[in-house]
């Protein structure tokens, strides 16, 4: 076996399959692009679903990749097992209807055992096969030459995730030797494929032969596929003779960096601290890559996953004695390890560090909140003479605050309490079940369709230079079938050439007409999409007979196209302006280019200020008024990148690409349609800016006529305001409004002073009405004040004058009730709490509340219940 680094293994794999005619597909973003079914890219095949389900036909049916992936099921096992990770790399080779079992098996064996490649000892390799897959077994035995005792039948060797491609698979295992056997020799699991550490699975070859239909039947696929996956971390652990994946060069530099933080704890000192080192190393890899790909910590979706990973890593840092923000210091270490194939982490190092550090510092504040909650719960348990912390509370601390169960156990043990492990496990299992349900929905692929996939005719787009074009009608599809003619209803058409732009890249499809040679409109074009083999598929409403093989005139709606051109070029200017104002991290996360408006989604950590929006808008308009020529060129992808063209991360580009140059200001890869000069846009106006998800914000804007109409509407509204504030000239509106605001403030201040005097008068009356129950002096009264703030002011007066032991006040405004309860420290010392009192009386007014032992408040919706609430005070005190 050769001595290789992880970088060498990755590159060797890609080089091997490139030599077998495969195209190397770059690793896609961890954040799925145009796939709402996935939370994360979780396998090498996840980015290729469109090829496997037949919705798109690849340029080369042979594909290989090294794909970064994230799986977050069983996060709590990370660090405790030898090979469980949140982020990992999957090496894969794929065939879309090209080669099948024979080549897949032979090439796998060649890569593993060939002297030019990994050079594994063949005697250490075992394979498992599906019992009914006699062909795979025959190839392994008769062609590869494996002995029968190295081929094991396993019933589970059938890959099936619901509707979509499915089929048998064969798995390859490496025998690490008897020293790795972690179960008794006679254990039934002691075999390749069993639950043991001796036989390590390194490669899974899936033979997709069937469509698993929604009706739960299995039908032969029109095109059989190969989908393989080899875990890089596992293979490297074998090559580098590492006991677990964590002792490889993918993780050890991170672990050493944690050791260097000066806590005097070293990796290998103890199993417990080793777990913490592993968790930190694993989680910072996932965080660095995910944030670099545009995901940001939040309380929902993938942002919640990142927040949970970061908090778990911070808590394990505390176990190593690290009590300050430290994870951000590890980001450059991750970047250096992966830079040979994933330069993006180092390229975005500053931004990733900023996000991680900010989140760490916030969590240190949250930890204190969690400890406060835990201490409160412990006190309640002790007050109730209990001895066990409820499992739901433990889970809430774990899930919300990132508290490891062990930490809760330690605190509870110090307080002489036990923990409800069974209750905690019940909550954990419920969460796992929710995750499993989500994954079962996420991972299924569409059922493969043969109709469009088998249409091979070429269809050329001529719409960059023409809006009207005569072309032969090649294909008519109606009712999911190929037909020779159509005379009514809806149909899908493919022409030899077309000026109609198909919906893609955020730009909506053109609309227009199909005319016959007599100039009569025979169909309205209502939508255009790309077919699997790249043809332009026109969805039409048929008005008169259409026949295959005839020549028709295709006419794009010129007015609509012109409006789209302006908005598309404006999005390019806006994209560059965003980066100029907010920073290079502000990447496009989605867009819509329609005739009436444009929408641009972008990644950004934090709010966008009104000043920043104004600067962006000004920059775009300046570029419009500079009358910059917009030049498009067609070139190869490498040349385009060398030109500095901005590629949208996660998008797939072919060998030939279009580069849109707006002078030297903006250079982007784009297949859309654009104006010839920025001055054609006219004017640009931002309509709104908002957050739409974790770390993703949206700008909506208009150009040209729509921008002018918006400005007209804003001017009309301004004139209305001028009339309302009695300002004869628009330029005086601001001054007049400021004067009115000052008058309003003066009146509010005067009103508050009057209200205060009235409250003082009421206080004089109510403070005289002191009642007594069982030696407790109390005041309970309804007062006429406007809000809770004035109730608190009355309570402050009561406290200063020490007029009674207990005070309860109520007020009602606009059908809303406010209640306040206050108690002296003497009452608190006797076990009475204002919070308990308020909880007892609040239901009478249809509400609830709480607070401190000395003061509490509540709200309600039933003013009619105030009298009952105040009467309940005496009952509560009598029984307290």
Curated annotation (Swiss-Prot):
Domain of life: Bacteria
GO cellular component, one term: cytosol
Biological process annotations from GO: alanyl-tRNA aminoacylation
Record carries keyword Transport: no
Group of enzyme by EC: ligase
Binding site for Zn(2+): 568, 572, 670, 674
A molecular function (GO) term: zinc ion binding
Entry-linked PROSITE patterns: AA_TRNA_LIGASE_II_ALA (PS50860)
Cofactor stoichiometry and binding remark: Binds 1 zinc ion per subunit.
EC number: 6.1.1.7
Compartment(s): Cytoplasm
Necessary cofactors: Zn(2+)
Catalytic activity from the UniProt record: tRNA(Ala) + L-alanine + ATP = L-alanyl-tRNA(Ala) + AMP + diphosphate
UniProt keyword terms in alphabetical order: Aminoacyl-tRNA synthetase, ATP-binding, Cytoplasm, Ligase, Metal-binding, Nucleotide-binding, Protein biosynthesis, RNA-binding, tRNA-binding, Zinc
InterPro entries to which the protein is assigned, alphabetical: aa-tRNA-synth_II/BPL/LPL (IPR045864), Ala-tRNA-lgiase_IIc (IPR002318), Ala-tRNA-ligase_IIc_anticod-bd (IPR018162), Ala-tRNA-synth_IIc_core (IPR018165), Ala-tRNA-synth_IIc_N (IPR018164), Ala-tRNA_ligase (IPR050058), Ala_tRNA_ligase_euk/bac (IPR023033), DHHA1_dom (IPR003156)
UniProt remark on domains: Consists of three domains; the N-terminal catalytic domain, the editing domain and the C-terminal C-Ala domain. The editing domain removes incorrectly charged amino acids, while the C-Ala domain, along with tRNA(Ala), serves as a bridge to cooperatively bring together the editing and aminoacylation centers thus stimulating deacylation of misacylated tRNAs.
Function text: Catalyzes the attachment of alanine to tRNA(Ala) in a two-step reaction: alanine is first activated by ATP to form Ala-AMP and then transferred to the acceptor end of tRNA(Ala). Also edits incorrectly charged Ser-tRNA(Ala) and Gly-tRNA(Ala) via its editing domain.
PANTHER family: ALANINE--TRNA LIGASE, CYTOPLASMIC, ALANYL-TRNA SYNTHETASE
Family label: Belongs to the class-II aminoacyl-tRNA synthetase family.
Protein's name according to its UniProt entry: Alanine--tRNA ligase
Source lineage: Bacteria, Bacillati, Bacillota, Bacilli, Lactobacillales
């Amino acid at each position: 076996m050769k001595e290789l680094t992880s970088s060498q293994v990755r590159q060797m794999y890609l080089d091997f399959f490139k030599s077998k005619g495969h195209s190397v597909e770059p690793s896609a973003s961890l954040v799925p692009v145009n796939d709402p079914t996935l939370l994360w890219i979780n396998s090498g095949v996840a980015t290729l679903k469109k090829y496997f389900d037949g919705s798109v036909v690849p340029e080369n049916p042979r594909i290989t990749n090294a794909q970064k992936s994230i799986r977050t099921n069983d996060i709590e096992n990370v660090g405790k097992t030898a090979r469980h990770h949140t982020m990992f790399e999957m090496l894969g080779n794929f065939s879309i209807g090209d080669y099948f079992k024979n080549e897949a098996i032979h090439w796998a064996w060649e890569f593993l055992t060939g002297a030019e490649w990994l050079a594994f000892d063949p005697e250490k390799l075992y394979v498992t096969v599906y019992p009914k897959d006699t062909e795979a077994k025959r190839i392994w035995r008769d062609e590869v030459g494996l002995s029968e005792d190295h081929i094991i039948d396993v019933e589970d060797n059938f890959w099936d995730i619901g509707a979509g491609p499915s089929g048998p698979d064969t798995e390859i295992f490496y025998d690490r030797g008897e020293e790795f056997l972690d179960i008794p020799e006679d254990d039934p699991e002691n075999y390749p494929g069993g639950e043991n550490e001796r036989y390590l699975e390194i490669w899974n070859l899936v033979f997709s032969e069937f469509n698993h239909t929604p009706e739960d039947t299995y039908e032969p696929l029109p095109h059989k596929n190969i989908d393989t996956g080899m875990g890089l971390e596992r293979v490297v652990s074998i090559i580098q003779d590492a006991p677990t994946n964590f002792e490889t060069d993918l993780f050890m530099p991170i672990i050493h960096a944690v050791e260097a933080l000066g806590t005097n704890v070293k990796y290998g000192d103890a199993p417990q601290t080793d777990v913490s080192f592993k968790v930190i190393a694993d989680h910072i890899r996932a965080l660095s890559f995910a944030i670099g790909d545009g995901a940001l910590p939040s309380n929902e979706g993938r942002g919640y996953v990142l927040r949970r990973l970061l908090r778990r890593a911070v808590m394990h840092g505390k176990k190593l004695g690290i009590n300050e923000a430290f994870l951000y210091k590890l980001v450059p270490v991750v970047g250096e390890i992966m830079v040979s194939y994933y330069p993006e982490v180092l390229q975005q190092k500053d931004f990733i560090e900023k996000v991680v550090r900010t989140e760490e510092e916030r969590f240190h504040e949250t930890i204190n909140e969690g400890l406060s909650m835990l201490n409160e719960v412990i006190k309640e348990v002790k007050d109730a003479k209990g001895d066990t912390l409820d499992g739901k509370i433990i889970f809430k601390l774990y899930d919300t605050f990132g508290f490891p169960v062990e930490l809760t156990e330690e605190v509870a043990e110090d307080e002489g309490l036990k923990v409800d492990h069974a209750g905690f496990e019940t909550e954990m299992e419920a969460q796992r079940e929710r995750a499993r349900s989500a994954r079962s929905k996420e991972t299924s692929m569409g059922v493969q369709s043969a109709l469009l996939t088998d249409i091979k005719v070429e269809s050329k787009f001529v719409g960059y230079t023409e809006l009207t074009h005569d072309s032969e009608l090649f294909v008519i599809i109606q009712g999911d079938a190929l037909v020779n003619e159509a005379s009514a209803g809806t149909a899908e058409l493919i022409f030899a050439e077309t000026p109609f732009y198909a919906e893609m890249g955020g730009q909506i499809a053109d609309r227009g007409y199909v005319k016959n040679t007599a100039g009569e409109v025979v169909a309205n074009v209502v939508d255009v999409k790309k077919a699997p083999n790249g043809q332009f598929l026109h969805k039409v409403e048929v008005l008169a007979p259409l026949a295959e093989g005839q020549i028709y005139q295709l006419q794009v709606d010129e007015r609509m196209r012109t409006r789209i051109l302006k908005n598309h070029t404006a999005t390019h200017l806006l994209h560059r302006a965003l980066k100029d104002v907010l920073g290079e991290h502000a990447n496009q996360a989605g867009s819509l280019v329609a005739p009436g408006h444009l929408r641009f989604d972008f990644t950004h950590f934090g709010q966008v200020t009104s000043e920043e929006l104004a600067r962006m808008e000004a920059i775009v308009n300046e570029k419009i008024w500079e009358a910059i020529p917009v030049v498009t060129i067609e070139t190869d992808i490498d040349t385009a990148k060398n030109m500095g063209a901005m590629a949208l991360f996660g998008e797939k580009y072919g060998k030939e690409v279009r580069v849109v140059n707006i002078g030297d200001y903006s250079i982007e890869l784009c297949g859309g349609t654009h104006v010839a000069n920025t001055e054609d846009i006219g004017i640009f106006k931002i309509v709104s800016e908002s957050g739409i998800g974790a770390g993703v914000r949206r700008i909506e804007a208009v150009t040209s006529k729509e921008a002018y109409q918006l400005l007209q509407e804003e001017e009309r509204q301004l004139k209305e305001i001028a009339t309302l504030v009695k300002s004869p000239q628009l330029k005086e509106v601001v001054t007049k409004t400021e004067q009115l605001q000052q008058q309003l403030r003066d009146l509010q201040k005067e009103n508050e002073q009057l209200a205060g005097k009235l409250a003082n008068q009421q206080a004089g009356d109510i403070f005289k009405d002191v009642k007594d129950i069982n030696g407790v002096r109390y005041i309970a009264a309804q007062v006429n004040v406007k809000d809770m703030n004035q109730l608190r002011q009355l309570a402050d007066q009561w406290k200063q004058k020490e007029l009674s032991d207990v005070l309860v006040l109520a007020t009602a405004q606009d059908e809303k009730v406010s209640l306040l309860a206050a108690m002296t420290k003497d009452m608190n010392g006797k076990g009475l709490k204002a919070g308990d009192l308020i909880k007892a009386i609040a239901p009478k007014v249809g509400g609830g509340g709480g607070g401190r032992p000395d003061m509490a408040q509540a709200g309600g919706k039933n003013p009619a219940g105030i009298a009952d609430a105040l009467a309940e005070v005496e009952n509560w005190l009598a029984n307290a």
